[in-house]
A protein has these predicted regions:
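Short alpha-helix adjacent to the SAM-binding motif of class I
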Residues: 14, 21, 42-50
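A structural alpha-helix within SAM-dependent methyltransferase catalytic domains
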Residues: 20-24, 106
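Conserved SAM-binding loop
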Residues: 1, 11, 58
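Conserved redox-active cysteine motifs that mediate thiol-disulfide chemistry
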Residues: 4-21
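Solvent-exposed loop/turn segments at secondary-structure junctions
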Residues: 6-10, 38-42, 63-65, 94
């Protein structure tokens, strides 16, 4: 699950706990890769150390990766399969640990 986010994005911050919980709950079945659009490296580091334990995360202050996916509003997530194909796009915050989403991931 490729997630584009930023510390200055309130909906992104709201979504983070469910991303962390999804990774914890699904284990190796799902890998959450969170790409921050933050320009401020200190804010990014402080936030990720405090709130994003267990997630793979990088900072892309030039927005190159999100531009490759056509993403200009955050949060936005892409479910990418093992072959690198985008299976689904999610625009806006998602409650990743809702019963519907857990069922969706379990059926993959």
């Amino acid at each position: 699950l490729l997630n584009f986010w930023a510390t200055w994005c309130a909906p992104c911050v709201q979504e983070v706990p469910s991303l962390v919980q999804l990774q914890s709950q699904m284990g190796s079945k799902v890998t959450v890769f969170a790409v921050s659009m933050d320009q401020d490296e200190a804010a990014y580091r402080a936030f990720t150390l405090k709130r994003m334990a267990g997630l793979l995360t990088v900072r892309d202050p030039d927005h190159k990766s999100s531009a490759m996916y056509g993403t200009f509003a955050y949060p936005e997530s892409f479910l990418i399969d093992k072959d690198g194909k985008i299976q689904r796009k999610f625009v806006g915050p998602v409650e990743w640990t809702s019963p519907e989403m857990i069922d969706y991931f379990n059926k993959l």
